[in-house]
């Protein structure tokens, strides 16, 4: 019976990822992996852009130094889609394996995972997978169990790859550990988040965001229900293009409300099993996640968010508010499973009830299976990309790379014309400047990198790009957008192929604009690494090992003395 839960979790992961397990890359929206990602200033939060993907890019640069990037990608996705349901099943306070399986499937086969995976938000999927393990370790810390704190540290570590994941993990860890442990858990949570927190605070351009994104990235309705019912069902992501078609099923709002009702009944049994305080905090945090997710859709909520992101540093993290529904996923999954367990006591055919409850997520969202029924595919980069990388790596000249056409996203025929983030910043061995304006429903949402706006003005005036730290211009072919010939006039063509053309900017190349100060940022990185390393050593080394060795030597010395 011990193997049932791991087996179910493995089946769930393979049902989604089997078509993607061959060699090659899955490139879709924000999910961009490269064969060998270089460690660049942006990966540490030292560039001109805000650290949105810090320390994820730095971690991937180290990982791809050990294994090919496509192998790293498959390991990350498999581990996340396996660990999430496994952790949720283990967290349920019950002796019934069947009820644990219900919770595992509800947690692993959710709209949150599907939509974030299709959006390419793999760090969010990783953070989501960590939450059950964080909750379990936090509850163990609250109970004062041995080695609970290092387990909590290691459970949080993969989640802090991005600011959002780090905050979601840190808050859950603190809530589950309880008030009496705040003196320990809060400093640990802050230290783990230092790799992105310090670059954000010390960023010379500040950390304010455009108010345009408050409404554009708000949770959205997926059927005839409301954004609230979508979020309660763990859906509602702002981008309609990544939503599984089954989320528009007419019965879904009714099923969602009934499921929430069952979950609320089941959550009543958490208090006698976990204790009133942790159970209440756990459920309240889930409710807060729902409230944040739908706040921008309420009357006046969008205006409040727009003011906050443009006046409060760091409030831009509240955009794309549906991501905070991750806090609701565990209460929903555990509560529903416990509700099914409670209902089973009054039914004679308990097996049928549990089977239906377990299969309901798969029945209502079958198009999550098999990589979204072909939505995701494995592709290879054209040879042009490796050729340009080689040219740039062999040149010692100064300067960053400007990628054209000016657009954050690309659509290449070699990737099935899928919308994908420009791979140049992760594929090439130099800092690459790309446009950070995002278009949502045809409306532009301004970016946060002041350097991009400056370079846009330089190109409009046909000024010298080298004076602004640009030493190379990369033109990507076969993707929407155009390049003004005047921008390329006077540049020297270095390499050209069917997909890419690389130009050298002549003359003296000025240094790039300064980012966050290097010393405190690196110190924060080392502090986070030290916390993780300490947690790992603490967990691996036997308790009292050195004290026992010391006592043994003392006894031997005394025996020799006599």
Regions found by a protein language model. Name each.
Residues 42-43, 191-270, 321, 457-460, ...:
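Periplasmic/ER-lumenal interhelical loops and adjacent helix-loop junctions
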Residues 9, 82-91, 98-178, 182-200, ...:
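Membrane-embedded helix bundles of polyisoprenyl
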Residues 113-125, 245, 283, 287-338, ...:
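Membrane-helix boundary/interfacial segments in multi-pass membrane proteins
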Residues 6-10, 210-212, 361-562:
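Extracytoplasmic
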Residues 10-85, 105, 110-128:
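Membrane-interface coil-to-helix junctions
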Residues 9-48, 185-232, 402-422:
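Aromatic-rich transmembrane-lumenal/periplasmic boundary elements in polytopic membrane proteins
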Residues 187-190, 337-367, 525-532, 561-562:
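Signature aromatic-anchored transmembrane alpha helix within multi-pass, membrane-resident enzymes
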Residues 236-239, 250-291, 532-545:
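Hydrophobic, aromatic-rich transmembrane alpha-helices
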């Amino acid at each position: 019976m011990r193997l049932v839960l791991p087996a179910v979790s493995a089946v769930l992961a393979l049902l989604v990822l089997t078509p993607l397990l061959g060699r090659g890359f899955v490139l879709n929206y924000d999910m961009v992996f490269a064969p060998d990602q270089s460690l660049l200033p942006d990966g540490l939060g030292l560039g001109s852009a805000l650290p949105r993907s810090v320390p994820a890019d730095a971690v991937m640069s180290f990982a791809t130094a050990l294994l090919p990037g496509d192998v790293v990608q498959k390991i990350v996705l498999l581990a996340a889609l396996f660990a999430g349901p496994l952790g949720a099943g283990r967290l349920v306070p019950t002796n019934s394996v069947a009820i644990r399986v219900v919770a595992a499937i509800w947690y692993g086969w959710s709209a949150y995972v599907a939509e974030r995976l299709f959006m390419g938000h793999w760090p969010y999927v990783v953070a989501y997978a960590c939450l059950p393990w964080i909750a379990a370790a936090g509850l163990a810390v609250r109970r004062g169990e041995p080695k609970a704190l290092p387990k909590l540290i290691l459970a949080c570590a993969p989640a802090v790859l991005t600011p959002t994941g780090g905050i979601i993990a840190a808050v859950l860890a603190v809530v589950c550990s309880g008030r009496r442990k705040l003196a320990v858990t809060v400093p640990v949570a802050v230290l783990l988040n230092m790799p992105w927190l310090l670059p954000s605070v010390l960023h010379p351009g500040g950390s304010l965001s455009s108010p345009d994104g408050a409404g554009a990235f708000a949770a959205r309705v997926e059927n005839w229900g409301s954004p609230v019912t979508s979020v309660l069902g763990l859906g509602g992501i702002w981008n309609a293009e990544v939503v599984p078609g089954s989320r528009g099923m007419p019965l879904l709002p009714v099923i969602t409300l009934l499921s929430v009702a069952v979950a609320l009944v089941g959550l009543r049994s958490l208090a006698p099993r976990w204790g009133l305080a942790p159970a209440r905090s756990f459920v309240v945090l889930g409710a807060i996640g729902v409230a944040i997710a739908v706040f921008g859709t309420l009357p006046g909520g969008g205006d409040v968010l727009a003011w906050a992101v443009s006046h409060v540093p760091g409030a831009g993290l509240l955009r794309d508010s549906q991501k905070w529904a991750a806090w609701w996923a565990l209460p929903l999954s555990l509560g529903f499973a416990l509700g099914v367990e409670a209902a089973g006591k009054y039914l004679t055919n308990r097996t049928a009830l549990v089977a239906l409850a377990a299969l309901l997520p798969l029945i209502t969202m079958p198009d999550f299976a098999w990589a979204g029924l072909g939505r995701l595919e494995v592709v290879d980069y054209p040879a042009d990309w490796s050729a340009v990388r080689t040219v740039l790596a062999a040149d010692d000249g100064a300067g960053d790379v400007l990628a054209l056409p000016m657009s954050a996203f690309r659509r290449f025929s070699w990737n099935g014309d899928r919308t994908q983030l420009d791979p140049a910043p992760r594929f090439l061995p130099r800092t690459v400047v790309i446009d950070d304006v995002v278009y949502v429903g045809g409306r532009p949402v301004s970016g946060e990198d002041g350097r991009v706006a400056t370079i846009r003005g330089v190109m409009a005036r046909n000024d010298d790009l080298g004076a602004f730290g640009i030493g190379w211009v990369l033109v990507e072919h076969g993707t929407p957008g155009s390049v003004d010939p005047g921008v390329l006039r006077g540049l020297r063509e270095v390499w050209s192929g069917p997909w890419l053309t690389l130009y050298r900017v002549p003359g003296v190349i000025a240094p790039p604009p300064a980012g966050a100060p290097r010393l405190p940022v690196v110190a924060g990185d080392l502090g986070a690494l030290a916390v993780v390393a300490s947690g790992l050593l603490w967990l691996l080394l036997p308790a009292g090992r050195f004290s026992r060795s010391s006592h043994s030597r003392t006894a031997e010395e005394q025996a020799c003395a006599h």
